Amino acid sequence: MACARPLISVYSEKGESSGKNVTLPAVFKAPIRPDIVNFVHTNLRKNNRQPYAVSELAGHQTSAESWGTGRAVARIPRVRGGGTHRSGQGAFGNMCRGGRMFAPTKTWRRWHRRVNTTQKRYAICSALAASALPALVMSKGHCVEEVPELPLVVEDKVESYKKTKEAVQLLKKLKAWNDIKKVYASQRMRAGKGKMRNRRRIQRRGPCIIYNEDNGIIKAFRNIPGITLLNVSKLNILKLAPGGHVGRFCIWTESAFRKLDELYGTWRKAASLKSNYNLPMHKMMNTDLSRILKSPEIQRALRAPRKKIHRRVLKKNPLKNLRIMLKLNPYAKTMRRNTILRQARNHKLRVKKLEAAAAALAAKSEKIVPEKGAGDKKPAVGKKGKKPVDAKKLKKPAGKKVVTKKPAEKKPTTEEKKSAA
């Protein structure tokens, strides 16, 4: 299948190229805006709604009055009387059985929406441009794999068809009948209450036939399921983009296809059949951004890239980070080394003192002579059977005498002083 070309071939009723070519209208190059199409479709579809409302008397066709407080029941109005289940039941409220609904619907709701004319035309232009792209048409679910060309244009002789069998034969010759078979396969019963409201069966959408003059073409195609017929002068966004999604499969007659430039104009000429209307333009004529940025015109205007790298300095604590301290104060390394040596030297002196004290204590214990014989020698113990103190636990040198505290003298009381006197 061929893609969009500047010249479009016109196909005959036999499904072959007739040899005639038509220039591609400018509307098929318009910007495709799915957001605008969806917005316009949503608002225009609201204009087909029928106003509805509930009765103003619904839920209030009874006499009920609140019982007030003091009865340990809710203060909702209750039906009067007795002798029936209804008496004493709640009424009027939206939470009550048989009561009115919350905010009863009114017929004066704002049902319709106004859409700008230019915006509606923009949506139609986008839908037409999308119908010429095979990828978008296939993404919508249309079976156009065997269709010879998009957009598909046929001769004006088709507009004079009056029999459905002629229309079916044309669709089969154009390889568009697969899309109709898809519609037949999709026919099914509607889910929900629409079955009760004369909307029992649903089906998918098929091709959209766009013609210029009705010489019987409507009668020929209207009985084929899924087919939509549109006059080129009365294009409808609800038909060109069902559901608000672009990509409808369209089949054009030659005269309708040629009329598009007069209806929507080109970028050099305004539309002749519409007053003061210009075709919307692209914001970017070339969407290849990398090609634009690498073009010599833009590269000449750009300055050379800055290759110097500026790194943020991370502030570190020199009291915890030796490398940063040495960077600030190189003498800190010498001070640190001297401190370590001094601590090692002091440790050696402390160990020597403890060893000397232990040796002196051992010599003193050997000089003590026991009263009994040498055989009855007992191990030297401290006072009250305590173990001898280790040399390491001694805090004072052995040369000094241990000062013992004298017991404090008891002072005489005042009574003792009086008796003594």
Swiss-Prot record:
Residues modified to Omega-N-methylarginine: R97
Entry-annotated residues carrying Phosphoserine: S290, S295, S365
Organism annotation: Rattus norvegicus (Rat)
GO molecular function: 5S rRNA binding; RNA binding; structural constituent of ribosome
Cellular component annotations (GO), alphabetically ordered: A band; cytoplasm; cytosolic large ribosomal subunit; cytosolic ribosome; large ribosomal subunit; nucleus; postsynaptic density; ribonucleoprotein complex
Crosslink (Glycyl lysine isopeptide (Lys-Gly) (interchain with G-Cter in SUMO1)) position: K364
Membrane-spanning segments: none
PTM description: Citrullinated by PADI4.
Modified residues (Phosphothreonine): T266
Assembly mode: Component of the large ribosomal subunit. May bind IPO9 with low affinity. Interacts with RBM3.
Protein name as catalogued: Large ribosomal subunit protein uL4
Keywords in alphabetical order: Acetylation, Citrullination, Cytoplasm, Isopeptide bond, Methylation, Phosphoprotein, Ribonucleoprotein, Ribosomal protein, Ubl conjugation
Protein family membership: Belongs to the universal ribosomal protein uL4 family.
PTM annotation (N-acetylalanine): residues: A2
Chain's gene name: Rpl4
Modified residues (N6-acetyllysine): K14, K106, K259, K333, K353, K364
Localization (cell): Cytoplasm
